[in-house]
Amino acid sequence: MIFSVIIPCYNCVKTLERTVESIRVCGLSDYEILLIDDGSNDGTAELCDRLCGKNEEIRCVHQSNKGVSAARNRGIDEARGEYIWFVDSDDTVDEDSLRGVLETALLKKPDMLLFGMSFDYYNHGKMYLRENLNPPSEGMLSLQNLKDDFDEFYNCNALTPVWNKLFRIDLLKKHGTRFREDMFLMEDYLFVLELLPFCKEIYSLRKPIYRYRQAEDERSAYRRLQRIENLAEYMQPFEQGLKTLGIPCEHVENLYSMLLKQRMYYASFSEIRSLVAQHNRGKYCRLKQPHPLKIYLCSRLVRIRHKLAVAVKSSSFFASSRARGFSSVS
């Protein structure tokens, strides 16, 4: 068997079947789909069983609710293929879109294969924007090649997720690379960082294959950030992973600054004051922050502008779709 597709499933009864069907027609052959039900309580578990019963290439595993990282790790343990691909339960791929990926994997046999993706933005259930992101280069890369162009790969989001990559399972198991189950933000990126030092050959495809559905609930990432008591301490595994790769410390600082900014985006004024005070006592205190009041006011202004931009883009997109004879885009 060549491919094991791992789909962690938690309360996704409305989207899972569409995701599974898109994989079944994406052009893969000699593959399995592993549905890891992570203690769902909305009918997802029963849907997993039905899909498994109807399709011989689908297997289903049930476990108590432990989180997406534990579900992915269970998938690694259960997988039978040469390559593993992690897919989220509300995302899709286009028909026949992975045929070229299949051919490349069979011919080149890289340790890791990465490809492009699109971010699909929705408003009231309808897509109003698709943003394609592709790796900066095409072809086989050595680890040193990737390190030399690390910023370019990072800035186009080619490195941070796992769902735009195929991984050799024997490499994961040989080096014991797992998802950190005590982390709930950017655990994908840490997984990639910890595996990269063992990848001798990496193949890059400049084609947007994976369709990532951006959550309409913009506060979901913020709620996960709220669970981090000390952001500087949370950064330590990323710092170690980047240090092992030989990536300059400025990258860690930029990552920290980005997460701190996101953490303060929806925060109250008192929360921002507390976060800035904690920052000023911490490891990254040399990265100067504006006055808490300025942060608070700027965040509110940006949120207002964002809501207006979404409303304008949505109405323009829907009007254009109607003019072309379509009521919506999915």
What feature does the model see in each segment?
Residues 207-216, 221-253, 262-284:
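Catalytic core of nucleotide-sugar-dependent glycosyltransferases
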